């Protein structure tokens, strides 16, 4: 597995973790090798300079690592699978050499094209086509960059994996002449019988100064996540007489819209919600899941996703927590778990669904029942992904 480009955002790390868990469920004897560049300031600066020279010369470059590699490695090893970490330098040739050193059959997922001349099998990955569906959220330069990157993947990869059937439909619409075979992964939150300690739950709640009753939004503060919809819905719910709060986790920076988080804070202040909205930022995964487990429900107000529900809904279903999710076509692909939908962008409809959740809590399946269903789904996911990787490794799509 190629770790560099997936480590640049928490959703990418979660995606790799889900894939490793699924593959391990059907082929536990198989070792997953994570290829990633060494984390070193000196080497990163040298690699950055090399990439600049290569760009001027028109030569292919490899992406630099995003988040610290330890975060990625820890997340993958927590899956329970056997993980081997393989270092490589910043060139495609060294990447190929690293694959040979560890006897890798195929490389996945590749968010940039390795080209037709790359000597070993590889599988492309496209998270979404947000720049096509929501172009106003991107600069012209970034739209061109994404177009070029995705066009190359779709022309040069033998197969490309996406997270939803909706993304396949988008690719067929915007890149109708693509050459790659497209595969939409089945919706599959990870199966685990995680036990939440009541004492640790109280400890976490005290540490973060959380109230007894709250909904949760667990997204990075990107503009398309539409936190403002949840904020205004909370205002309506409180005005209707319900004493409930909202807890938010996730990074607070949107690089495309640096002022977005300040705009959201302005909405909170304007509507006198400072006391009722708790923004915790990016917190340890264990704490995030504990807070999620203690919540009334996870709210997913997003206006765009590349996978059903986004990562927070995967986690919510996995730990048997209900969700209230915007009714985007991609989110309608959620076919497991306790989920209620609301009209995307509608403050009134979300508020109504929140009140309904307060007044009539859903009947939840047992944790054991959820685990059993997710285990079967996880094995289906693992077999499906393993089949794709095996076919590419054998050159069946060449």
What do these predicted regions represent?
Residues 1-398:
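Carbohydrate transferase catalytic cores enriched for Leloir-type hexosyltransferases
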